[in-house]
């Protein structure tokens, strides 16, 4: 019972982190990164507690996270000191023994140890989150909950992004002033980042629409979520985002066709209706800007 409770807390914690990381302007600033990394350490402690109370806990279930941990290990190796210490300050010709520790620099594989340390810290946090996800999403009920939560969140944040674009006053969330040198969209300071978020979110409800036979109300909600998310990504004017989403939609259309042909299931017109809906809504909201943007894709 304790193990189930801890897993439920981890699941809610993980989904809340995914949502808040987006809302915090994409978690690219120092304050949000610190919270993101400390939060990962808290989840690591909870995973340790889960291992202690769960008799069925098996680390081999988490083996898919090994590439991330291997990459983290490579980052640590790049920070490992080797060779003879060199002066980092003071007279260049001074003998090392006459310098303090603050004036010595130990050679490392990394040419920029400070940047490497920052990346290693972020990679550690991401590895922890991914490992937790592998543990909590073993259950099909948890996966269904994640699809519902992320689909509704994707719908809400995309609707907010469209509304913010139509009523843009030079401020994120209509409150925070942004520099004239950035190109924000939604909660992000870079429209390409918003498009990247949509590329990750909209396949979840879209795949559910194609491969699952759910209730009518849920299907309508997911279809609306996909249309709004794709529309928001198109209106972000991210050329790479448009091309990537186009490839994703083509892939899902092919998957839907094969699914229908092999198993005789799945709604035949779902991908086509979603594409048509997203295109029409995008043209209705931003016809002229889209034409200008498509004219620059060849560049």
Question: Where would I find each of the regions flagged by the language model?
Answer:
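Extracytoplasmic catalytic/substrate-binding loops of multi-pass membrane glycan-assembly enzymes
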Residues: 299
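Alpha-helical transmembrane segments of multi-pass inner-membrane proteins
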Residues: 1-27, 34-48, 68-72, 76-82, ...
């Amino acid at each position: 019972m304790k193990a189930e409770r801890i897993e439920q807390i981890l699941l809610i914690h993980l989904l809340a982190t995914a949502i808040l990381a987006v809302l915090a302007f994409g978690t690219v600033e120092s304050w949000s990164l610190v919270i993101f990394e400390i939060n990962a350490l808290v989840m690591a402690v909870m995973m340790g507690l889960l291992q202690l109370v769960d008799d069925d806990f098996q680390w081999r279930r988490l083996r898919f996270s090994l590439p991330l941990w291997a990459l983290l290990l490579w980052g640590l190796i790049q920070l490992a000191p080797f060779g003879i210490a060199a002066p980092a300050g003071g007279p260049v010709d001074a003998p090392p023994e006459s310098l303090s520790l603050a004036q010595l620099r130990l050679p490392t594989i990394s040419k920029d140890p400070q940047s490497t340390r920052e990346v290693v810290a972020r990679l550690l946090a991401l590895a922890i989150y991914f490992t937790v996800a592998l543990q909590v999403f073993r259950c099909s009920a948890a996966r269904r909950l994640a699809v519902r939560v992320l689909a509704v969140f994707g719908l809400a944040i995309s609707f907010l992004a469209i509304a913010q674009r139509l009523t843009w006053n030079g401020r994120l969330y209509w409150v925070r002033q942004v520099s004239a040198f950035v190109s924000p969209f939604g909660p992000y300071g870079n429209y390409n980042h918003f498009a990247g978020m949509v590329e990750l979110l909209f396949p979840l409800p879209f795949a559910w629409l194609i491969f699952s036979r759910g209730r009518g109300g849920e299907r309508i909600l997911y279809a609306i979520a996909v249309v709004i998310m794709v529309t928001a990504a198109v209106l972000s004017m991210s050329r790479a985002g448009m091309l990537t989403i186009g490839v994703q939609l083509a892939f899902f259309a092919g998957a839907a066709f094969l699914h229908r042909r092999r198993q005789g299931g799945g709604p035949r017109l779902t991908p086509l209706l979603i594409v048509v809906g997203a295109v029409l809504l995008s043209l209705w909201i931003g016809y002229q800007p889209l034409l200008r943007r498509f004219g620059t894709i060849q560049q």
